[in-house]
């Protein structure tokens, strides 16, 4: 029998052979190997307007990532680190062979450079994917870096997996209540870059109507079938179903189209919708075009594919009628069998297709232009390689993809090791987060083992942003023609053959009605006598390796339905399971021994047919046991590792099954904010902002997954001695008390790095920036003191202390506008654009990097580091969602101590536990204590319970402590023994990146906004604290009139305006006469100064612009002393 260790060996082998970001790498590798060439083949050849000239397209290939320093220089290979440091794009040049054909005479094939393709790190095109560890260290890479991201303009970009409803599948549902549509079937047909939705609706009058893009209105079902070549009613009826009851339901639809009897008439009917008022031939031609190109394009776009489309449409209509007759349930849109995840390869294919089309369009234009001028054909000179390069780079840099999707690529989150891995495994749903799609946000049963049940954000994205579970993989997809061939070889009879046998050979309809329908990727292939048997045969040939392991098959049998669904498309989330035969798993102890010795790997077990990947649809046929002891002869599969239902982050939580579920969700969010060692090459990286914990520790209470994820090598936290007690009252409301002496010994110290960089840009017209120390005459000169740290080259030197406002890189630029330039002397014309340390930040210059960009401009990067020692207000959290800020630091002498002299590092208030039910934390405290006393880490993997709590308590008793983990404690200030025993244990605490030093902010005077003249907002702009409407209401309630005036007028935007005493308008200042003048009465009236809020003056003037005439009526000013004067 497989014990825990054996199953763990299988799971461990999975992570070793597949890594943690396999899904992106597989997808991108498939793009490089197959899809890239496929896009070229789709284009086939470039046809021009020039008579007799076309260009055939051949093979495409890519080289190793490289750059060309200057326009004419040689190509040179680069490393990812060089790309990061010099703000380059890590991309490979791509070459396409082209054959010019002039007057049917083929020329010599020429290979032409057509652009650069950004390369995913660790993919097949990346040379670092097979370098040994020492070589990786030599080129400045973190040897454990998993790859799966791109480097664009020096920054790391991840492509986020996009979850979508499966395309090319018919989904049926009830119509909206109250409308005249009773049932709906939708299919989004997607092929070669465009998606077309086809809607099939059953109306209250029992007719069936079809609507799709480019054809206005609805088309009756029978008419579109005739247009597709099903001329007689009998053809149409048998295409839909062999069942007389369903055939009867088609009568109203057939009657609706009774006047149209031929394919030509049907095409003319459609032509009248798309080409109104044209000649009949034109109408028919246009209708044929529309049907071929925009109706179900995934089945093909040539006239030969019309029959195929007819059968597809008929099977969709059959589905609607089955729903109407109560023979099937509506499709569940949230079932994971109906979802597909689009990964980097998919998204890159659609992006490259659009870029390549733009490239072809430009090439055609250039060819025609050069032919008009009568030049010799020289392809090399006409190809503009930057079209593809820029299109792809721009999409990756901004995240704006083709098809109007935003946020597809994001900056890789490098807060710590976990946050990076989690970002690479994230899955985003395409639903709008503004709507309350409750069902879509819920955890669905089919997500078991595919999506992490805990890791999802709080707030508007909850349930829409998910993360892959540990063992989940995403299918890459194989060509369906292979599977189709196998199905026909196994004896599947095509729909056409069945109809032919019934109509021509007069075979019995009843016979075929009992047969199973066979679907391949949602398309009806045909009929088979025994569906269960067929599914079994397909599974067997998959397990024997005759069929690709990408293929999944499900047999669906209900009272009415009898269907086999075969899937082999891309984007299905699948999970591996051990195959069980007669109650015994096929993986035996012999296999485990070989696994542990490294003789075989996980992939070998898949090849041997002992483990298989199951998608959500096939899992409907599986009966999976959670543990070997649960197996019965009925079981078909066994889970490899029960806690693999969790994602990467949730699997670091010890004892998560003892916590209330939302607590695990909170921890999943906070683990991404904890500080640790985010990359082992941090010293040479130039991240915009980075945090580094000085002394990260491995948790004493481990879960098995920590090792395979790599958390033990890149931890983010430290083990703290925790006492759960109320002490001094400074740990109320989730704050914690920390031992000041522990902090002085270096506990939870961290460093914050911030990068400042600038480049000498060259402007059109020969002007350029200069990195130098600015001279006193320059516009915007800051004063000598600010430039004191600069060296002769205008850059600060390393290990210099800097404070907010100090210049790190001196730089002068030409003026923004030309008219300035003409008036001023050349020296005055320059403006100071130096890079200064951020306001309120200080630190030490850590690294200065001077290099060149690809254009040959000088690039300077300066990294400043700042030591962060924990202080009051810094945020900490355990691994159970228990977050709190430091309430006070107490010296060790004043902290409580146990009889053995142990002093806690952290004191947590007991009120943090009962209502939150984080029992996992109490168990961790006990486990940590046992680990520290016994000297071996404790395994707290979920669903295992090894070692059991009771056993640990017995051991703790043997080691001389109370089994309930409590201690007799003495008050540190008085030395008195406390009445209660206090729970002492060791808990892993994480320091989060919310620190007081980054948030503390106050201001007296400072900058104001130009428009309203009110103080700016926010810490970065030295803004004020807003005294809002509710605060104002409080002061009104208190009756403090002077205070209201002080806050809302004197200290905000007090302004004096001059008002005409006759008309009440705001006057203007006449410089020549040196006085204020009324815009209506000119000099004839007197203007009086009035103190108002500047925002009020602005409001008046904005109202005037809308032709509303506000006037201020002046009265006597009343002094508080009682005497009145003007």
From Swiss-Prot:
Catalysed reaction equations from the record: RNA(n) + a ribonucleoside 5'-triphosphate = RNA(n+1) + diphosphate
InterPro entries of this UniProt entry?
DNA-dir_RNA_pol_su2 (IPR015712), DNA-dir_RNAP_su2_dom (IPR007120), DNA-dir_RNAP_su2_hyb_sf (IPR037033), RNA_pol_bsu_CS (IPR007121), RNA_pol_bsu_protrusion (IPR007644), RNA_pol_Rpb2_2 (IPR007642), RNA_pol_Rpb2_2_sf (IPR037034), RNA_pol_Rpb2_3 (IPR007645)
What are the record keywords, sorted? Answer: Cytoplasm, DNA-binding, DNA-directed RNA polymerase, Metal-binding, Nucleotidyltransferase, Transcription, Transferase, Zinc
Which Pfam families does the entry mention?
A: RNA_pol_Rpb2_1 (PF04563), RNA_pol_Rpb2_2 (PF04561), RNA_pol_Rpb2_3 (PF04565), RNA_pol_Rpb2_4 (PF04566), RNA_pol_Rpb2_5 (PF04567), RNA_pol_Rpb2_6 (PF00562), RNA_pol_Rpb2_7 (PF04560)
GO biological process entries: DNA-templated transcription
What protein family does this chain belong to?
A: Belongs to the RNA polymerase beta chain family.
Please report the name of this protein according to its UniProt entry: DNA-directed RNA polymerase subunit Rpo2
